Amino acid sequence: MTENLYTYGIIEQEDLELDVEGVAGAEQVYTVDYKTLSAVVSDIDTTDPERTDEDVEAHNNVLQEVLKHEEERTVVPMSFGMAFKSARTLKGVLRGARRALRSTLNDIEGTVELGVKILGPGDDTVPREEIQENVTDQLADLSINETENDLFTDRLIINKSYLVDFEKRDAFDSAIDDVEAEYDELTIQYTGPWPPYNFVDIHIGAEQQQGGR
């Protein structure tokens, strides 16, 4: 069995096993502990996994399963490709980043990320600025923070990520229902819950990924 570990995210210390397919076809997802932290991992035969659509989807699916496995679990997500030479190497990384990880867990405790895209016909037949202002106002009081994402097509009117408290999730869902009813001629894409990808900033050195000196 390979010793390499692919890492999806960090949670509060917990023994966790998930029956979900991981990156590179991994059949088991489990945790590696360091003090009060647990890394969600699976076995992999490389420390430099190729970024494919299939594996990016698997990475995201695992993180969503971690969130679903127990209501109100907080996850610090890792970006795709974080693989380590051994459990010992991973624990060393957790030791070095422990303060930052603990701070981030505290900052995002009890929250999830929700994505909202609104698409129109891509012309001037809809009042884009009015829609942007109205929807932003409706969702602002139900979220802790928000980020503007790229409007990568002329059809996009809104592309935002919202940081939402677990306790306001139902109210946020209802607000999206109201937006869909008000703008039934537009396409509303509502995704999540996700770990707060757009609201964390954790960096782990490449030399640590490969095992260091």
Curated annotation (Swiss-Prot):
Disruption phenotype: No gas vesicles are made, gvpA1 is still transcribed. It is found in: Gas vesicle; Cytoplasm. Changing D19 to A/R: Small gas vesicles. Induction: Part of a gvpF1-gvpG1-gvpH1-gvpI1-gvpJ1-gvpK1-gvpL1-gvpM1 operon, maximally expressed in early to mid log phase. Detected at very low levels in growing cells, at slightly higher levels in stationary phase (at protein level). Not detected in isolated gas vesicles. Gas vesicles appear earlier when grown in static culture, possibly due to O(2)-limitation. Changing D15R: Small gas vesicles. Keywords: Cytoplasm, Gas vesicle, Plasmid. Its main location: other. One of its GO terms (biological process) is gas vesicle organization. The keyword Cytoplasm applies. Changing E72 to A/R: No gas vesicles. InterPro entries: GvpL/GvpF (IPR009430). The keyword Endoplasmic reticulum does not apply. GO terms for cellular component: cytoplasm; gas vesicle. Binds GvpA1 in early growth stages; is the only one of GvpF1 to GvpM1 that interacts with GvpA1 in H.volcanii experiments. GvpF to GvpM interact with each other in vitro, and may form multi-subunit complex(es). Interacts with GvpC1 and GvpO1. Encoded in a 14-gene plasmid locus called p-vac which produces predominantly short, spindle-shaped gas vesicles during all stages of growth. PANTHER family: PROTEIN GVPL 2. Might be involved in preventing aggregation of GvpA1. Proteins GvpF to GvpM might be involved in nucleating gas vesicle formation. A minor component of the gas vesicle, also found in soluble extracts. Gas vesicles are hollow, gas filled proteinaceous nanostructures found in several microbial planktonic microorganisms. They allow positioning of halobacteria at the optimal depth for growth in the poorly aerated, shallow brine pools of their habitat. Expression of a 9.5 kb p-vac DNA fragment containing 2 divergently transcribed regions (gvpD-gvpE-gvpF-gvpG-gvpH-gvpI-gvpJ-gvpK-gvpL-gvpM and gvpA-gvpC-gvpN-gvpO) allows H.volcanii to produce gas vesicles. A minimal gas vesicle can be made in H.volcanii by gvpA1-gvpO1 plus gvpF1-gvpG1-gvpJ1-gvpK1-gvpL1-gvpM1; lack of enough GvpJ1 prevents formation. The same region restores gas vesicle production in H.halobium without the p-vac locus. Belongs to the gas vesicle GvpF/GvpL family. This is Gas vesicle protein F1. It comes from Halobacterium salinarum (strain ATCC 700922 / JCM 11081 / NRC-1). The lineage of its organism: Archaea, Methanobacteriati, Methanobacteriota, Stenosarchaea group, Halobacteria.
